[in-house]
Amino acid sequence: MSTTRHTITVWQNAGQRAMAMDILDEEPLAIRVQGQPYAVVMRTPGDELAHAAGFCLTEGLVDRPEDIVNLAACNTDDTNVVTVTLTPQRRDQIAGHLDRRGYISQTSCGLCGKTLIDEVMQHLQPVQSDVTIPLAAAEQCLRNLDQFQPLRRSSAASHAAALFDAELNPLVVMEDVGRHNALDKAVGRLFLDRRLDLAKVVVMSSRISYELVQKTVRARIPIILALSRPTRLALDLASRLGVSLAGAAKPAGLYIYCHPQRFVELR
């Protein structure tokens, strides 16, 4: 569990007291591709190889595990570094992409400095899937997400990304200070295990940003469920790329924002 115990001062009922609290860790992860710095992301330490693999997939650097010749972590006192070596063929295919290195990701925004939706659309193919899930079961996945969030229970500061199969069986759950990092870690874990094709549903503890839609499309997952609502750009991108978006309604139920055909009511 990546937290650090810290003593804080609590002010309640006109009085003060000291209390120990678990604070979520946040550190930089440098991702090097072909021996050159490519990205620095601020994240919760842990699952570095899965994180880097998922980042490379969802950012378009790789399409298959076989595109990666070597994936290795190097830990030092000051930072964490993961090096990614691609096959010569893949390196040549994405030479222009590699020239855009210098991606800096903050925990609140994984697309800092990136171009907007029109450029994103040029590099993505719509998701084609006839998978359907029951409405009630989809809502239950959202309501039960906190059961898979030990970091959130201890720190109250992390996001979670959970991937489910077509029968809504959980495949992997990852937590991180950044919602996009949590998704990269979850996708990367299944990608390295060669099980990503089983994933049909993403469940997020956060709002749905267009970056999360982009990453989900790269992973070829047709459905996103989230506790909070999507942004307008996220909804636009999902509508155009065939991803179903739904979120938790209050006090119960679902808000279905686009492609509702994948949600069915069992009778």
Show where each model-derived region lies.
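Intrinsically disordered, low-complexity regions enriched in acidic/Ser/Thr/Pro/Gln residues
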Residues: 1-161, 165-166, 170-173
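A short, polar/proline- and glycine-enriched secondary-structure boundary/capping micro-motif
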Residues: 50-52, 94, 182-185, 267
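Phosphate/diphosphate-binding glycine-rich loops and adjacent basic-rich segments that engage nucleotide
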Residues: 109, 266-267
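A mid-sequence, solvent-exposed acidic-amphipathic segment
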Residues: 144-205, 212
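Feature captures the catalytic cores and cofactor-binding loops of soluble hydro-lyases/lyases
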Residues: 180-265
